[in-house]
Amino acid sequence: MDDRDLLEIIRPVCGSDTCSDDCAILTLPCGALVTSTDMLHERSDFPAGMTGWQIGWMSVAVTISDIAAMGAEPLQIVLAIGLDTEERLAEIVLGAQACCDTYGAVYAGGDLDAHSELTIVSTGVGIIRDGEPVRRGGAKPGDIICVTGTLGRAILGLTGDSRFWKDLCEPQPRVREGTVARLAGAHAMMDISDGLAISLYDIAAESHVGMEISSGRIPLPPEADVQVALEAALYGGGDFELLFFISEEKMKNLTIPVTQIGRVSEGLKITMDGMELPKKGYLHHW
């Protein structure tokens, strides 16, 4: 089983409406708060060679990326850190603070404990002051499928290409882009940290639609081998870019550079270049 299978155990308890997005939502009279939490382990999430500062940065960035995917502004981060050795703490919290400072969030402490493996749980709160969050369930047939940035960089760094090592270790959440997409009228959005393919399937499942994308339109690093980079972009994960869906009419409202990779279709099939796209991505398995 993988983490998406296990989510089906949680849905009946919490309710599908609260378990279907990058963040949980608390509606306010004048906007909304969004919250997300992420658990990272050294063996599975922090590659050998990462500095403590980069570990702290990444631990915060993954949560801020979830907040960005709702079109929200990050407010506050708390970290629960299970330390394997106390000497690592100072560098980790400096990296965490740097990421918070970069994206306008407050690092507000958290919890400390001893642990045999370095484990960090990051919890974040974001706010939308002027509207509603963008969820995963709003994609409509005819919508244009858009992504920010270039994809595949993180896995290229993980597999030995030093040109992309920083992309892997110091992800840059797309907070501004998420807000712009929300204000432009995006119908659905999520981050693609688990890979583009599985993210398309996640949106399709919540929106009850199909999708048609073109491999030639997926933005890849020009300096990398095309096929290797395409595989990394589709299935590798680690790219904290945004995937969103917007009508052709509302595309003119966007003030950020994005790439159009396809369209939403009727039915439930997802295809790339006319062939069914494998449902694969970065998953935790039990």
Curated annotation (Swiss-Prot):
EC number assigned by the record: 2.7.4.16
SUPFAM superfamilies in UniProt: PurM C-terminal domain-like, PurM N-terminal domain-like
Residues that, per the record, bind Mg(2+) 2: 38, 66
Annotated keywords: ATP-binding, Kinase, Magnesium, Metal-binding, Nucleotide-binding, Thiamine biosynthesis, Transferase
Remarks, miscellaneous: Reaction mechanism of ThiL seems to utilize a direct, inline transfer of the gamma-phosphate of ATP to TMP rather than a phosphorylated enzyme intermediate.
Gene for this chain: thiL
GO MF term list: ATP binding; magnesium ion binding; thiamine-phosphate kinase activity
Function (record text): Catalyzes the ATP-dependent phosphorylation of thiamine-monophosphate (TMP) to form thiamine-pyrophosphate (TPP), the active form of vitamin B1.
Family, as annotated: Belongs to the thiamine-monophosphate kinase family.
Species assigned in the record: Methanospirillum hungatei JF-1 (strain ATCC 27890 / DSM 864 / NBRC 100397 / JF-1)
Name this polypeptide is given: Thiamine-monophosphate kinase
